[in-house]
Amino acid sequence: MAPADLLQPLEGQRAETLRLIESLMAGDLDVVVRGDGRTVQQLLCHLVDREHGINFAIRRALEGEVLHLSQEEREQISRSEAAPAPAGWDLLRIRTELVEARESLRQTFLLMREDDLDRAIRWPEWPARTIRTSIPYMLEHEDSHLDELRAAIDRERKLVS
């Protein structure tokens, strides 16, 4: 199987995320998601940020460099993810950013050969140690946030009606 073919489950998951975005209204972006208190907008922007970060780590691995983040660097990532979502990122912008982030990841995978999938990669909080073994974590990450988003929107709509 070609490396880019391994993105099919991720692309299916992204299609679900995009369908959710299409069902949202502008006011839904301010709904608070249970858990860490982020809003729908912040969580969607987090998906964009995380995908760019993963793509960066994979590209470094393809160049023979394994990222090793210090505790301080990990904490900095956590702080930046907790920061307010970019001002002016409406539903259309978020959708566009998610599509572009996935296309960028796809381009990275198109550059790979089969043996590249076994290159070392490290990403904070994931036990995966190769590009190949990171793919299920990428899928689970977006899927779990999509569940949180759906629950928050459903809860909010029940309160309003």
Show the residue positions of the predicted features.
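Short hydrophobic/aromatic segments of transmembrane alpha-helices and their interfaces
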Residues: 12, 26, 99, 127-128
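Acidic/histidine-rich alpha-helical segments that form the ligand environment
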Residues: 9-13, 78-118, 134-138
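Alpha-helix N-cap/loop-to-helix boundary motif
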Residues: 2, 9, 35-39, 46-50, ...
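Alpha-helical bundle segments that constitute or directly flank the non-heme di-iron/ferroxidase center
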Residues: 1-28, 48, 52-60, 137-140
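A structural signal for long alpha-helical coiled-coils and helix-turn connectors
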Residues: 22-25, 62, 113, 153
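Short, contiguous alpha-helical
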Residues: 30-77, 117-161
